[in-house]
């Protein structure tokens, strides 16, 4: 059986799956890749990089461009939400102290229940909205 190789040359060599094999430069027995690369050097894998070995363990450095936690004002740390992370990256972050104070009062109101939120026109917290949708009356 005669096949036409990659460069139009007639060849009758086939690999184990029946695909034609081009015999260039004395190399024999290698399959042709999907992009025409002979079985030599088709994949460019690098076993080690600059002599560094990690033994399959992912290592992270201790530094990062933005912290995922901040001081909670009571001597501890708390995780930042997505909103705080975005605000931190935006220009004009001079209102950090005012935003921190406002957020603390909003969090206290959010989890405190429905103490006058409808009468004073304040925004309802997430927990209040969820509680309204639950069956079984007002909690």
From Swiss-Prot:
Family the entry assigns: Belongs to the plant dehydrin family.
Expression induction or repression: By abscisic acid (ABA) and water stress.
GN (gene name): DHN1
Entry-linked Pfam families: Dehydrin
Signal peptide interval: none
Sorted UniProt keywords: Stress response
Region listing for Disordered, in residue ranges: 1-139
Basic and acidic residues bias locations: 49-58, 83-98, 120-139
Organism: Hordeum vulgare (Barley)
A GO cellular-component term linked to this record: cytosol
Gly residues: compositionally biased ranges: 23-42
Biased composition (Low complexity): 59-68, 99-109
The protein, known as: Dehydrin DHN1
GO biological process: cold acclimation; response to abscisic acid; response to water deprivation
């Amino acid at each position: 059986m005669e096949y036409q190789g990659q460069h139009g040359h007639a060849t009758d060599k086939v690999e184990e799956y029946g695909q034609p094999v081009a015999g260039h430069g004395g190399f024999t027995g290698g399959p042709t890749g999907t992009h025409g690369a002979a079985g030599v050097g088709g994949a460019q894998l690098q076993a080690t990089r600059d002599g560094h070995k990690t033994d399959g363990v992912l290592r992270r450095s201790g530094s990062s461009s933005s912290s995922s936690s901040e001081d909670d004002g009571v001597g501890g740390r708390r995780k930042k939400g997505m909103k705080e992370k975005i605000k931190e990256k935006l220009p004009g972050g001079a209102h950090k102290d005012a935003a921190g104070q406002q957020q603390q009062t909003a969090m206290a109101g959010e989890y405190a229940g429905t103490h006058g939120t409808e009468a004073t026109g304040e925004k309802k917290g997430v927990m209040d909205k969820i509680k309204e949708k639950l069956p079984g009356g007002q909690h």
